[in-house]
């Protein structure tokens, strides 16, 4: 499996979604043994007015991690639970072949985030995969019309819907972790067996450790077995002989190889929420007041701009004396864990 790593990289700007078997599609209302929806974000590569092309994972109140190959820059946007966040800066891993970057969000102050899985024993672990993008389309059978299903087409457009599935880590190398898309009750299939498809690159592979969900991988690509080119479909059996098991591969950036680098880039986590801390340094000071002043008397605050970049504390749609009062109450507070 490791030999196909270079071949399963999708073209620049492409990303992934999630496809399940019809009998394995989870009920997201009743399936609670998984990470919170709020730890996955939509990556909007080209900013306002452009559909997204990927996903990201929240790893700190003001930081997400994602892959390099879906492109974008500081003009890109991140949407988490319907709220749009702008970007302060992006730092890609210094090694070119490492498909990983850290993104600093502007005044996000998110309460839901995950730690990095840094134990290098991923092989054999059950995982939960999450990301925005395309899902399962019509079944593929051979001969056509026979009902002998070997896979599914990808369906949907854009990355507006969050999907979750389960899988298992089958193998690892220094850069990546790997899984495959088994048929139900075949191979190492899991309860909600699924595979990434289109518009989910940067989405998370999560492993439960010590009672907490931790991010172990970032979705990067998929491949049919052998030399078969990806054709907007996912297979679990051979396309010319559905009696033969033929599971597609899926791959993710291995977070345990880069957890220390990620931790060195992001700021320390504050000891509880700090109202008015715009720059994420766990204190409310003149730097934060300068940020607040830039939004003073705005009347267009809403989820599309993170309520005027967090300055509309109430929030009621504008930045006024009520918000100034909130800022004053927390002046010079310091909350570093």
Give residue ranges: language-model regions.
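Acidic glycine-/aspartate-rich tracts in secreted/extracellular proteins
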Residues: 69-75, 106-111, 132-137, 171-175, ...
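Cellulosome-associated attachment modules in secreted, modular CAZymes
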Residues: 269-337
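Chymotrypsin/trypsin-fold serine protease catalytic domain
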Residues: 106-195, 219-224
């Amino acid at each position: 499996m490791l030999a196909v790593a270079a071949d399963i990289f999708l073209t620049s700007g492409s990303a992934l979604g999630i496809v399940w078997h019809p009998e394995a599609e989870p009920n997201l209302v009743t399936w609670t043994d998984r990470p919170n929806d709020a730890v996955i974000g939509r990556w909007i590569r080209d900013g306002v007015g452009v559909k997204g092309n990927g996903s990201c994972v929240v790893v700190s109140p003001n930081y997400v991690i994602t892959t390099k190959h879906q492109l974008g820059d500081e003009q890109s946007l991140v949407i988490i639970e319907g709220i749009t966040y702008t970007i302060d800066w992006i730092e890609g891993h210094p090694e070119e072949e490492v498909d990983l970057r850290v993104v600093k969000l502007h005044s996000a102050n998110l309460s839901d985030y995950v730690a990095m899985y840094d134990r290098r024993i991923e092989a054999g672990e059950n995982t939960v995969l999450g990301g925005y993008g395309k899902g399962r389309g019509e079944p593929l059978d051979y001969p056509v019309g026979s009902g002998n299903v070997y896979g599914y087409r990808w369906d949907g457009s854009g990355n507006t819907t969050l999907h979750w599935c389960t899988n298992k880590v089958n193998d690892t190398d220094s850069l990546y972790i790997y899984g495959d898309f088994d048929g139900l009750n075949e191979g190492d299939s899991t309860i909600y067996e699924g595979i990434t498809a289109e518009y989910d690159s940067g989405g998370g592979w999560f492993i439960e450790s010590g009672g907490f969900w931790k991010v172990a991988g970032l979705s990067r690509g998929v491949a049919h077995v052998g030399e078969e080119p990806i054709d907007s479909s996912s297979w679990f059996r051979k396309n010319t002989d559905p009696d033969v098991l033929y599971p597609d591969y899926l791959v993710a950036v291995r977070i345990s190889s880069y957890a220390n680098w990620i931790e060195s880039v992001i700021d320390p986590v504050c000891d509880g929420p700090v109202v008015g801390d715009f720059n994420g340094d766990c204190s409310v000071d003149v730097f934060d007041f300068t940020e607040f002043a830039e939004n003073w008397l705005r009347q267009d605050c809403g989820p599309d701009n993170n309520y005027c970049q967090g300055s509309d504390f109430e929030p009621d749609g504008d930045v006024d004396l009520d918000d100034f009062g909130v800022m004053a109450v927390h002046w010079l507070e310091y909350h570093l864990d």
